[in-house]
Amino acid sequence: MTAGKSLLRWASGIMIVLGAGHLLLLALFAWSDITGWVDRGVWAAVPLGLTAEEETVASAQNAATFWAGPGSFAVPLILLGCLTWHLARRGVAVPAWVGWSLAAWCVVGGVLLVPSPYFAGTVAGALVVLAARQGDRSAAQRERAMDPA
């Protein structure tokens, strides 16, 4: 599983860099909105908007900052990258469906938002799939070696 570990570590590194980079860029470009949340007391700083009030440019920008940051998939992508790294270190195979799902999500995102780093996420998904396939092959080879019939 050494090659599989290497593939999974590369995949997890890509996921962590994509998620952290996304949050870092948001912090750089929307710092005033983020500090505004703290100034307003954080609780319900981004209202759900179920009222009859008309949406202003400022409230739309506030909501966009939320959905581009903590409400985006950046945090779950970082967590998935950390989990993948942890599982690779322990020698536990990550299922191929995780890689296929990540790759499909990133292809759709990349097609909808061009140019974007979504396609790097497709590479991470492909690496997870390759690692799972290598793990399946090595398990089959071990079974054949144990069954001399």
Which residues make up each language-model segment?
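Short, intrinsically disordered terminal tails adjacent to the first/last structured region
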Residues: 1, 139-149
